């Protein structure tokens, strides 16, 4: 069986602990924790915040799966530090592994029930349905996710996904946030409604045209999730 490594981008924006608790519970209750080889908690903030969080769980990690990785202290870098740490790990690996990538979706709009529904949907497809993601990768897919769109670039809306490390290792690095002259400079085609460089993080995975599987689909385009509710009853029967 191919090794599995979770890369979990976490930061200290308001509501972080509630979202992190939710995802942690799913990682444990679905059996994913037992299946993975590593859970890389990629800390984008003060390390002691997440050290204290992990200690509060009183979890037995005798196998040493949980790795607290201090990728950066500035949440303004968004997902860049974790994605670049993942790229480094993929390139340095001596054998291939499957990547599960998640983050604390929706903290900038924490408390918005619409965004909470979107996060719940992606948690369901990425964490609860982890076996389906692994099966797709084992069958030849290089990337698996939800809500595949091609505008303004190919991407999985929301940016939760699984991928093969061999494919990720071929991706080009994303430009460092400090290299940006201003927020409207982007490495990929500008997002039509928000030209901020953080959308490069969503465009990155598909920049080398992977063989992909769309595991599930919800509201289209993804921005509708900011305006509409999407309860679990809309999708729990899909797979």
List each model region and its residues:
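ER/Golgi luminal nucleotide-sugar-dependent glycosyltransferases, focusing on the catalytic module
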Residues: 1-239
């Amino acid at each position: 069986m191919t090794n599995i490594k979770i890369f979990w981008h976490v930061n200290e924006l308001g509501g972080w602990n509630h979202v992190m608790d939710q995802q942690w519970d799913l990682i444990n209750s679905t059996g994913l924790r037992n299946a993975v080889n590593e859970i890389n908690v990629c800390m984008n903030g003060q390390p002691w915040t997440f050290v204290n969080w992990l200690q509060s769980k009183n979890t037995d990690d005798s196998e040493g799966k949980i790795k607290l990785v201090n990728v950066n202290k500035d949440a303004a870098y968004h997902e860049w530090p974790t994605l670049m740490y993942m790229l480094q790990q993929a390139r340095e690996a001596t054998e291939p592994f499957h990547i599960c990538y998640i983050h604390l979706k929706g903290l900038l709009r924490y408390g918005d029930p619409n965004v909470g529904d979107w996060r719940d949907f992606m948690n369901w497809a990425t964490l609860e349905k982890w076996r389906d993601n692994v099966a797709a990768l084992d069958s030849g897919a290089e990337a698996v996710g939800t809500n595949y769109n091609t505008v303004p670039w190919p991407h999985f809306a929301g940016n939760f996904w699984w991928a093969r490390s061999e494919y990720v290792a071929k991706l080009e690095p994303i430009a460092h946030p400090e290299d940006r002259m201003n927020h409207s400079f982007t490495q990929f085609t500008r997002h039509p409604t928000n030209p901020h460089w953080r959308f490069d993080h969503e465009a990155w995975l598909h920049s080398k045209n992977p063989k992909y599987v769309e595991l599930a689909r919800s509201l289209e385009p993804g921005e509708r999730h900011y305006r509409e509710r999407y309860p679990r009853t809309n999708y729990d029967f899909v797979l």
